[in-house]
Amino acid sequence: MSCCGGNCGCGSSCQCGNGCGGCKYSEVEPTTTTTFLADATNKGSGAASGGSEMGAENGSCGCNTCKCGTSCGCSCCNCN
């Protein structure tokens, strides 16, 4: 996988400008893991939460394409 030579990595030709770090952007962000603990004695009358709502990885980017925004920003990225 190419990280677009330091470009933002948006679009098919990776020409959104430089200084964005390309795919290396995700390496500088701290990786955090959030764990939710449910009370086993919860007496709620609603439907049980089945864990089907998982956050997307890599900055919650859920798309396969990148769109160049202002200042070389990507409004929708999936840079694994």
From Swiss-Prot:
PANTHER family: METALLOTHIONEIN-LIKE PROTEIN 2A (PTHR33543), METALLOTHIONEIN-LIKE PROTEIN 2C (PTHR33543:SF18). InterPro entries: Metalthion_15p (IPR000347). Keywords: Metal-binding, Metal-thiolate cluster. Induction: By heavy metals. Metallothioneins have a high content of cysteine residues that bind various heavy metals. It holds the Pfam family Metallothio_2. It comes from Oryza sativa subsp. japonica (Rice). Highly expressed in stems. Expressed in leaves and rachis. GO terms for molecular function: metal ion binding. Belongs to the metallothionein superfamily. Type 15 family. This is Metallothionein-like protein 2B.
